[in-house]
Amino acid sequence: MRIQRTPAPPKAPRALLCVHGAGCSPAIFRVQLSKLRAALREDFEFVYATAPFPSAPGPGILPTFEGLGPYYTWFEGSPSGAAAKGDNSNSNDSNSSPTVHDRLAAVHEPVRRAIAEWQTQNPSIPIVGTVSFSEGALVTALLLWQQQMGRIPWLPVMQVAMFICCWYQHEATQYMREEVGCGGDGGIDGEKLVIRGVLSLHLQGRDDFALAGSKMVVAQHFVPGEAQVLEFAGRHHFPNRPRDVLETVKRFRQLCVRARVIG
């Protein structure tokens, strides 16, 4: 007797690049995004990049994901672990930590590899946007800015982006200023620090230790007409209350329609 195999479900027509937080992993991020993935499963596939450096578990990982390592971080020598204790915007020990430029150079390879592997295996399913969390959200913002400046042509054109509880360092803004020659006060070239052409949704937990920094990222580096902020009752995590999840999906879908990513 011949056993019939159940056909694999058809893949969605487009994909989102997922960038996990510090002290996390693609496998854990997949679980963290389970409600979002379920809601968007007919519209998007999810492509996961793995951070380059082994690390201890990050903020909010324990006890839920205890023993489910290895865990990875994007920035070697990153103070994002210290940020969990409240210092989320001012860490400038440049003598002991790599520069933002050096950190981004290390980030490029694993992100580029994840994208290339996806494009090779799924040439008809383009990556059109991103979903990122915490340190990964800061990484994503910097990558989008680098792409805008013509530095990383290998990154697909991102039309939509979801930033979840974005972690922030002043070093990131200072790096941008130095790259465009603005100097310390930004001057007339301060407009070059703004990410344009990407419709974005910024999720911010009202009790998140990174809330102040997340607000700063939106205020300094995104266009008001292109960026939406959605606050939710929670801390440093993807929204978990049903009404917050529904509102997140609703807002993101609206951005996707506006960007003509979905009909």
Curated annotation (Swiss-Prot):
Enzyme class at the top of the EC tree: hydrolase
Keywords for this protein: Hydrolase
EC number: 3.1.2.31
Gene Ontology, cellular component aspect: cytoplasm; nucleus
Keyword Protease (UniProt): no
Keyword Transcription regulation: no
GO BP, one annotated term: secondary metabolite biosynthetic process
Catalyzed reactions per annotation: dihydromonacolin L-[lovastatin nonaketide synthase] + H2O = holo-[lovastatin nonaketide synthase] + dihydromonacolin L carboxylate + H(+)
Practical applications according to UniProt: Monacoline K acts as an inhibitor of HMG-CoA reductase involved in cholesterogenesis. Its hypocholesterolemic activity might be useful for lowering cholesterol levels in the blood and reduce artherosclerosis and coronary heart disease.
Annotated metabolic or biological route of this protein: Polyketide biosynthesis; lovastatin biosynthesis
GO molecular function: hydrolase activity
Induction trigger: Expression is controlled by the monacolin K cluster transcription regulator mokH.
Pfam families: FSH1
InterPro entries per the UniProt record, alphabetical: AB_hydrolase_fold (IPR029058), FSH-like_dom (IPR005645), LovG (IPR050593)
Active-site residues, as the UniProt record annotates them: S134 (charge relay system), D208 (charge relay system), H236 (charge relay system)
Family: Belongs to the LovG family.
Stated role: Esterase; part of the gene cluster that mediates the biosynthesis of monakolin K, also known as lovastatin, and which acts as a potent competitive inhibitor of HMG-CoA reductase. Monakolin K biosynthesis is performed in two stages. The first stage is catalyzed by the nonaketide synthase mokA, which belongs to type I polyketide synthases and catalyzes the iterative nine-step formation of the polyketide.
PANTHER family attached to this UniProt entry: ESTERASE DBAE-RELATED, ESTERASE OVCA2
Protein's UniProt name: Esterase mokD
Organism: Monascus pilosus
Taxonomic path: Eukaryota, Fungi, Dikarya, Ascomycota, Pezizomycotina
